Amino acid sequence: MNTFFKMSVMAGLLLAGQAIAADSITRADQIPQLHEEPQHATVSERVTSRFTRSHYRQFDLDQQFSAKIFDRYLNMLDYSHNVLLATDVAQFADKKTTLGDELRSGKLTVFYDLFNLAQKRRFERYQYALSVLNRPMNFTGNDTIDTDRSKAPWPKNVAELNALWDAKVKYDQLSLKLTGKKDAEIKEILTRRYNSAIRRLAQSNSEDVFQLAMNAFAHEIDPHTNYLSPRNTEQFNTEMSLSLEGIGAVLQMDEDYTVINSMVAGGPAAKSKALNVG
């Protein structure tokens, strides 16, 4: 692949990223409903077989262990217990002890159903947060916020959820206020931040869910055991070998856009002078 073609591809990717970022996600049905892909069943069966037969920590993938995997996965999806409702969690109660069977068979229905529900609820929460930004800011009350709700019960109803997010938005506003930002600027920054969070929901894919499910399983066996998807394995190997292939540019997300964070001196991107950092 010649340098010109590489640069053309990179420019196209950057423009495509900006076009996607410009799309406004305003409805829950714009968040994809993710489903298990065919290869995941085979991988799940093999990972489960390897863990149950060869892991140094001996364990039984029984109903009790399945319930622990469920609880870990649930907390990975909603660590602060401010997205899901108690009724959301309750509707999966009779499925808690079946996850071992799902992992063995490769049919990960509960994992995907719970992830999709969490995505829907998270979208609703950020939509609510955006609506809160339209209210006048008021820092005169004696408000408190619990910054660690990992052990707190899930909210019983939407009113309780709203109260938690009222506090979250006020905390975000006050944090910016203390840096000297004006009210209009605070609203603009938080609007961008919350909309970016919504767009990231729409960018989730089936592999993300599968990796999360496998890691809930792996971490319950041992906190130092991980499952890496093919994409993350490639990234891990690159970091370990300190090697970099491609046009020699490091990309990152900045708010809604993909930007060039740095370029490798002497690489195709730097030599072309067609791209700049920032």
Model segments located where?
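Flexible, low-complexity junctional segments that flank or bridge functional domains
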Residues: 2-4, 21-278
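Bacterial N-terminal signal peptides
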Residues: 8-16
